A protein has these predicted regions:
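Membrane-interface helix-boundary signature
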Residues: 1-11, 46-49, 75-82, 101-104
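N-terminal signal-anchor transmembrane alpha helix
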Residues: 7-28
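Core segments of transmembrane alpha-helices
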Residues: 56-68, 112
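Juxtamembrane boundary at the C-terminal end of a transmembrane helix
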Residues: 119-126
């Protein structure tokens, strides 16, 4: 594995790790002070929306599963799966930024876009 491939792999792993944290926030910590702070909500809203947050967390878990699958699968499948799931993360981040909070663009979409550029560069250089 050359340096560009290593960088791409690390960046994809970071995107997956970010989403593991989001899963934990949405499924486990939603009603806690950490969850309230992370999403800028109050206790009453968190209590009412906990089932929706858990559902959203589950979907973020699917993104993690896809990114890990892409990292572990042999090419060309690994490359294709990684590109697909990074694209899903980017779309989710852009949509979240447009509909919920612009910060999502930086937290979710930007790291995935950087990772996608690295993955494509590694594929073109390799």
């Amino acid at each position: 594995m050359d340096a560009v491939e290593i960088v791409a792999t690390v960046l994809v792993a970071i995107v997956a790790a970010i989403h593991v944290y989001i899963v934990i926030l949405e499924m486990v910590l939603w009603r806690t002070p950490r969850g309230l702070q992370a999403f800028g909500t109050d206790q009453a809203f968190a209590d009412r929306s906990a089932p929706l947050a858990a559902n959203q967390g589950l979907y973020n878990g699917f993104l993690v599963a896809g990114l890990v699958w892409g990292l572990l699968a042999a090419d060309p499948i690994g490359f294709q799966v990684t590109v697909f799931f990074l694209g899903c993360v980017i779309v989710a981040g852009v949509f979240g930024a447009a509909t919920v909070n612009r910060r999502i663009l930086v937290v979710q979409a930007l790291p995935a876009a950087i990772a996608l550029v690295a993955v494509l560069a590694a594929a073109n250089l390799g």
